């Protein structure tokens, strides 16, 4: 019988049971507990120690942009090869010359022609990955799937991460049925469906309040036949977001505690979900208590949490609590935005 692998020493079957129980409780109480209800391509920073004659990633991107815009795709191919040799990997701007204009179709066909001619291995695979991500950004999902087929036929290293931008785009647009068909396509090529792939579905359902579908996604994660799968930080972030959107602060807090018990790092955004719902629900004192419970561990987190809370309190005219938070920020030497700094000077320092 399949079991989820414990992250540390906690049986994550219990975790999933807890999360599904929240769904059941939400349905029984007529609340929609939506909590169970980058792969992005980062720009590689230029090497600061590079010799003066060595090109940077930005320079390679600019050269590829000029070559692609002028229709010189042999130059594009050479640049794709040479940039990897020089440790200047592809970025989100590499295929920026490809846009939704009249030249789109011909440019894409030229790219399909030259990509199989790039250096075999990482260079070729990553070029396909980067182009697929670009097509998804342009909303050209069908063309992205054509490239997937090209990779499969050519045996160019088709892998799970290649599908991530497609699944991300489809689920964000609530094209769930299409996204599941992409999952079936992955399986047809013997490509494993990883936790990130499932997270795209889970986030979409939690955001929309589809309790039943989110619960089904969790079950699919448990039953995944490719191997042991554990929820990750993004999984729990989606669950906390869903709980907060349904007004279930206690459920969000329970999930947050579960993350800490299992040793998972908590995203700044996850804290923001909880803070926002507490203020929205009128739990002002509790929101202050919540941010203070995490204060002192991470300066940037403190700036995000305390600053966000202060802004929300001021917007709701909860000036007493806002002053308390701003005093704490001042004592801790935390950075304030212009609006908060002005409020602090007028209402805290001069009071």
From Swiss-Prot:
PPR repeat residue intervals: 124-158, 159-193, 194-224, 232-266
Any matching Pfam family: PPR
Superkingdom field: Eukaryota
Subcellular location field: Mitochondrion
Record InterPro entries: Pentatricopeptide_rpt, TPR-like_helical_dom_sf
Keyword annotations of the record: Mitochondrion, Repeat, Transit peptide
Main localization, broad class: mitochondrion
Transmembrane segments: none
Coiled coil: none
Location of the transit peptide in the chain: 1-41
GO cellular component: mitochondrion
PANTHER family given in the database record: ATPASE EXPRESSION PROTEIN 3 (PTHR47932), PPR CONTAINING PLANT-LIKE PROTEIN (PTHR47932:SF8)
Family: Belongs to the PPR family. P subfamily.
Name of this chain's protein: Pentatricopeptide repeat-containing protein At3g56030, mitochondrial
Species, as recorded: Arabidopsis thaliana
Classification of source organism: Eukaryota, Viridiplantae, Streptophyta, Embryophyta, Tracheophyta
């Amino acid at each position: 019988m399949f079991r989820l692998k414990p992250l540390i020493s906690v049986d994550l079957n219990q975790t999933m049971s807890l999360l599904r129980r929240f769904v059941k409780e939400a349905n029984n109480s007529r609340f929609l507990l939506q909590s169970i209800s980058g792969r992005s391509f980062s720009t590689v920073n230029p090497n600061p120690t590079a010799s003066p004659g060595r090109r940077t990633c930005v320079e390679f991107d600019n050269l590829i942009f000029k070559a692609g815009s002028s229709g010189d795709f042999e130059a594009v191919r050479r640049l794709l090869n040479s940039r990897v040799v020089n440790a200047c990997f592809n970025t989100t701007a590499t295929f920026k010359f490809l846009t939704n204009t009249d030249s789109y179709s011909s440019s894409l066909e030229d790219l399909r022609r030259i990509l199989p001619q790039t250096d075999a291995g990482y260079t070729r695979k990553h070029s396909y990955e980067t182009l697929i991500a670009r097509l998804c950004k342009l909303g050209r999902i069908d063309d992205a799937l054509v490239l997937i087929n090209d990779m499969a036929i050519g045996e160019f290293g088709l892998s799970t991460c290649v599908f991530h931008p497609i699944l991300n785009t489809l689920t964000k647009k609530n094209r769930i049925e299409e996204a599941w068909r992409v999952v079936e396509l992955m399986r047809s090529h013997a490509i494993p469906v990883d936790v990130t792939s499932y997270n795209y579905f889970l986030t979409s359902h939690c955001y929309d309040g589809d309790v039943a579908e989110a619960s089904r996604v969790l079950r699919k994660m448990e039953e995944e036949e490719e191997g042991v799968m554990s929820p990750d930080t993004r999984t729990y972030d989606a669950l906390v977001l869903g709980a907060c959107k349904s007004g279930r602060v206690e459920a969000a807090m329970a999930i947050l505690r579960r993350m800490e018990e299992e040793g998972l790092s908590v995203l700044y955004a996850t804290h923001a979900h909880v803070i926002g719902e507490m203020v929205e629900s009128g739990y002002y004192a509790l929101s202050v208590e919540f941010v203070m419970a995490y204060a002192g561990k991470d300066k940037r987190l403190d700036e995000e949490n305390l600053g966000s809370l202060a802004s929300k309190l001021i917007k709701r005219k909860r000036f007493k609590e806002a002053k308390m938070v701003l005093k704490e920020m001042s004592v801790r030497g935390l950075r304030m935005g212009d609006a908060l700094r002005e409020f602090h000077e007028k209402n805290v320092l001069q009071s």
